[in-house]
A protein has these predicted regions:
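Short, Lys/Arg-enriched N-terminal segments with co-localized hydrophobic residues
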Residues: 3-23
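Short beta-strand-centered segments at strand-helix junctions
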Residues: 37-49
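Juxtadomain coupling helices with adjacent low-complexity linkers
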Residues: 79-88, 119-126, 172-173, 177-204
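Short regulatory alpha-helical segment in sensory/regulatory domains of signaling proteins that mediates
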Residues: 86-92, 97
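Short hydrophobic alpha-helical segments used for membrane anchoring or interfacial signaling
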Residues: 96-108
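Regulatory sensory and allosteric helical modules in signal-transduction proteins
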Residues: 115-150
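A short, aliphatic-rich beta-strand micro-motif
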Residues: 158-165
């Protein structure tokens, strides 16, 4: 049995695992391993869990003979450090600060966490990150990028998105959000420094 584990909180992990196992049993999906040990993850599961070509997956086994594939996020591995770093940046900048990988919000400070934490990022934000674009915009601007998949957050009108790059690979972004204050040169330099620091942390 293959159990696909999304990189989420434990409650969502349990619920999603149950749903995916039920889905596999209900549809009767079976995949054979080829002579190189490869197995195809069905397109439906890849779409649901946002697994893309080239995404790293961790492989685990348990005592019952199950093989567990877990999406790997280098930024997510920072855990408490990412949370503390977001808090420090929020205090320094005076803005809502988010640290994201290419799937979801990993850490947030300066705002109601329920509004952002562990929420999926929007396809537009994922595209901007992958293109390594630095975005400074206000709602209504042509280059404004919604942060969340559903974009129901109304606590910000201005944004500054700075990609995190490590060893040539883009891993996520540092995001500053503000309700009424436009981002300037100071915020830009702070975000660049913060993104560079996190990128170096990933190399260790």
């Amino acid at each position: 049995m293959f159990r696909i584990v999304p990189n989420r909180g434990i409650r969502e992990y349990i619920n999603t695992t149950y749903k995916e196992e039920f889905f596999l049993k209900a549809t009767g999906i079976v995949r054979r391993i080829d002579d190189l040990g490869r197995v195809v993850i069905p397109k439906e599961i890849r779409r649901t869990l946002r697994i893309r070509e080239g995404d790293p997956l961790e492989i685990f086994t348990d005592r019952e003979g199950e093989i567990i594939l877990k999406k790997y996020s280098p930024i997510g591995e920072l855990g408490a450090f990412a949370k503390e770093y977001a808090e420090s940046l929020a205090q320094t900048s005076g803005h809502i600060t988010c640290i994201v990988d290419k799937d979801q919000i990993i850490a947030v400070s300066g705002a109601a966490k329920k509004e952002f934490i562990e929420k999926h990022i929007s396809a537009s934000l994922e595209k901007a990150i992958n293109q390594r674009n630095v975005v400074s915009a206000a709602r209504g601007d042509s280059n404004f990028v919604p942060i969340l998949e559903d974009d129901v957050a109304e606590s910000y009108k201005h944004e500054l998105i700075t990609p995190i790059i490590s060893e040539g690979d883009v891993l996520g972004a540092i995001i500053f959000l503000s309700g009424d204050k436009k981002m300037g040169e100071v915020e830009g330099k702070l975000a660049q420094t913060a993104a560079g620091f996190l990128g170096k942390q990933m190399e260790q």
